[in-house]
């Protein structure tokens, strides 16, 4: 018996793509903008809810498409108010999104891949391997479907996966998020974090004005290569060259993320080389405490050591902050996102 083909998903399509859809189905072109309004403004879950579209056209659309919204399958609340959500995507894989409330903002950290190819030594996500890219709709579904969606002020692409290894779908999701016919967000409320993926970074810098955060973690090539295999494919020097050539003269910002490990990248020599590398780039350096993960021979630096390293960078003229860990008790902090179900190859319970 031939399996029924899976319907295509409307969520994540741009206005141009929706126009192509309705044209191919023989509907008026203005129907595309109506559909966009239902998807991204009214945020419906079913095509039949799109009541300003004729019933005949809704039925025709439903033959080939579905909206593609799905609710999280579980959530966990941290003592500090951070909430971690677990989503199942169409491939059957699991991804997480983390809601981080603060006094003056409400941030959602979203995922772009099931697992990750980068396999950074200090990150749990890479330990489960790479299971696939999320579609633009699956990325946007995280934003639309968390309980706190109406409160959100900021989005960070810092969840599971390397966003620029899935550049086409990530950039499509940003396009929908920032368009007037989409979610209408300012690009200045969106930050993307990357280890450095050449073609993806070129596109991100050229096609958006969103903020950029670079996972740096060691200023020396060999030291960074030990921590991050991506250094072999795109050395930090190349990433910095592209940033220097990009336009950061307006409100767009670039920051550098630096997890500090005891005895690995915490010396005065590391601070001096980091300061030398970043000279001439208006930026912020975010120092991040390491969260111990099983089987990884890295140790977190003491709070006193973090302050010392921060002082060295500040003395060299850099705005430097130490990130406050959030959601550590529910494995939602930096480097801790993963799913035991995927790492174990398909157990029924997803946890950390």
Describe the residue ranges of each PLM region.
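Generic beta-strand structural signal
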Residues: 83, 95, 106-110, 118, ...
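Conserved AdoMet/S-adenosylmethionine-binding subsite of the radical SAM
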Residues: 147-154, 159-321
């Amino acid at each position: 018996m031939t399996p029924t083909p899976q319907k295509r998903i409307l969520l994540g399509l741009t206005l141009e793509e929706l126009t192509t859809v309705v044209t191919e189905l023989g509907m008026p072109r203005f129907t595309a903008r109506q559909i966009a309004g239902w998807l991204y403004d009214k945020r419906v879950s079913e095509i039949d809810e799109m009541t300003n579209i004729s019933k005949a056209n809704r039925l025709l659309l439903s033959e080939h498409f579905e909206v593609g919204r799905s609710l999280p399958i579980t959530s966990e609340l941290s003592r500090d108010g951070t909430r971690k959500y677990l989503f199942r995507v169409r491939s059957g894989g699991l991804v997480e999104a983390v809601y981080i409330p603060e006094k003056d903002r409400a941030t959602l950290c979203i995922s772009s891949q099931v697992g990750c190819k980068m396999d950074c030594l200090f990150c749990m996500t890479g330990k489960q391997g790479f299971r696939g890219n999320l579609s633009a709709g699956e990325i946007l579904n995280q934003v639309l479907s968390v309980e706190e969606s109406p409160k959100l002020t900021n989005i960070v692409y810092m969840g599971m996966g390397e966003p620029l290894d899935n550049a086409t779908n990530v950039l499509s999701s940003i396009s929908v998020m920032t368009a007037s016919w989409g979610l209408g967000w300012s690009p200045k409320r969106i930050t993307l974090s990357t280890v450095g993926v050449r073609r993806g970074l070129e596109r991100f810098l050229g096609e958006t004005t969103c903020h950029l955060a670079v996972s740096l973690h060691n200023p020396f090539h060999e030291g960074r290569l030990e921590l991050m295999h991506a250094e072999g494919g795109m050395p930090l020097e190349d990433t910095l060259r592209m940033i220097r050539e990009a336009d950061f003269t307006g409100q767009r910002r670039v920051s550098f993320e630096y997890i500090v490990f005891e005895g690995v990248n915490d010396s005065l020599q590391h601070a001096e080389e980091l300061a030398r590398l970043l000279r001439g780039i208006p930026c912020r350096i975010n120092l991040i405490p390491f969260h111990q993960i099983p089987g990884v021979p890295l140790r977190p630096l003491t709070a006193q050591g973090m302050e010392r390293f921060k002082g060295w960078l500040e003395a060299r003229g850099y705005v430097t902050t130490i990130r406050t860990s959030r959601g550590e008790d529910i494995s939602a902090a930096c480097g801790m996102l993963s799913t035991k179900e995927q790492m174990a190859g398909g157990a029924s319970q997803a946890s950390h």
